[in-house]
């Protein structure tokens, strides 16, 4: 079902949209490396869609009671967007949790294009990228003075 293609399903409700959709970078795999802002949104979210094959479940374990949790590992784009749009239509805060930083191999462009098509507001919360975490783990820096 190409839910997001049927604009008439949501256009007349557009004025009722109250919450943003958040794309959250979960960091490089260590649940403690999610940003403070990312964790706050996960805690407040009514609906969480996370890449379960890549994002440790511990990242979303702080969710509030009653939050709807979806593992997108078994979902296609249509299914993810159907959940996102329906939740947003009901005024729910949606957290779409990606591994690393959503803008690096996060495949968020196609999701953002669909949200743009319907005038749904969203925000991207960056995550700690693995290249930065790797430098920290091996105690190296990327820039050296006088080099």
Where are the language model's segments positioned?
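Short, Lys/Arg-enriched N-terminal segments with co-localized hydrophobic residues
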Residues: 2-17
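Glycine-rich, flexible N-terminal cofactor/catalytic loop recognition
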Residues: 18-74
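A contiguous loop/helix-start segment that scaffolds small-molecule binding in enzyme catalytic cores
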Residues: 19-21, 89-94
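Active-site glycine-centered loops adjacent to acidic/histidine catalytic or metal-binding residues
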Residues: 27, 97, 127
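Glycine-rich phosphate/diphosphate-binding loops that line cofactor/substrate pockets in enzymes
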Residues: 41, 83-92
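Short gly/pro/ser/thr-enriched loop/turn and capping motifs at secondary-structure boundaries
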Residues: 56-57, 77-78, 129-133
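Glycine-rich, highly charged phosphate/nucleotide-binding loops
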Residues: 73-85
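Class I SAM-dependent methyltransferase SAM-binding "motif I" and its flanking Rossmann-like core
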Residues: 101-147
